[in-house]
Amino acid sequence: MLIVLTTVPSEDEGKALAEKIIDARLAACVQVLPQMTSFYVWEGETQREAEHLLLIKTLGSKYDELERFITANHSYSVPEIVAVDCERASNPYLSWMKELLG
């Protein structure tokens, strides 16, 4: 199981992307977290932007397709896409994910 993180500039974009990911069966669950402030360097300048974080729960076998999907459907030219390997999760949750995502 992976938890994939990506950020978007608005709640509306986050909800739209989350729904598309779920409809495509690329993840079992996507959560859109409330607004936060991100700091990063872009084109040599420090940026400070309001963003929303998506937590995407999926299987490792879905990662490559999910990454391509996010890249194709994201408003950023270089979206943050970071996968964290989940060391442990409850057996019922993992079974549900595997059944849903294949």
Where are these regions (language model features)?
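Positively charged, small/polar-rich N-terminal and surface patches that mediate targeting and assembly
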Residues: M1-G102
